[in-house]
Amino acid sequence: RRSWAVGLLIISILTMACGGAASVDDYKAAFVYLGSPNDGGWTQAHDEGRQYLVEQTGIETAYTEDVPPDATEFRTVAEAYIEQGYNIIFGTTFGYLDIMEEMALEYPDVIFLHCSGYKSNDSNYTNYFGKIYEPRYLSGLAAGAITESNKIGYVAAFPIPEVIRGINAFATGVKEVNPDATVEVVWT
């Protein structure tokens, strides 16, 4: 079910990014993965979405796995795809955010789609993400219901909109079932 949702999200993004006049034959999509497609989590969900995209549209895709969140590494991989005619580049980790923004300016005919970021431009660079705040709300309900101390910790990575939405959803869930509980956020 998760791969279906990721695939549907990707198809929706491609439909919006590519417009209605172009054919699927006009596009080739490359995915740059932080991890392995069989990691049982983040990268696997993206790869299952990529496979679903191929099944549903027939678009040609490729991927490179285990690309660290390093600008030089990402650029090397993405430019190799661009040289091969790939005109849609998916970057699937937060660490690719800035280099994708930079490359979008350098390659205006290539669409750059970044997962979990917050930057975009008006032409060829945007981000995508699922409604992760919904399960965070449910987690907050559970935490608020089982706490004995009324003190709940939340570990967060970066103070960006996506993370703040998750914190707010979690805290809302906690307060829904336990108005006396407090949530303390610790940043890594």
Where on the chain are the PLM-derived regions?
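Short beta-strand elements in bilobed, periplasmic/extracellular small-molecule ligand-binding domains
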Residues: 56-66, 178-188
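Flexible loop/hinge segments that line or gate small-molecule binding clefts
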Residues: 105-130
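Short, well-structured alpha-helical segments in soluble
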Residues: 71-86
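Periplasmic-binding protein-like
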Residues: 85-93, 113-115
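Extracytoplasmic "Venus flytrap"
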Residues: 30-49, 53-56, 62-74, 94, ...
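Short, low-complexity disordered leader/linker segments with a strong preference
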Residues: 1-27
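An alpha-beta-alpha
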Residues: 50, 136-185
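Short, well-ordered beta-strand elements
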Residues: 27-34, 60-62, 151-153, 182-183
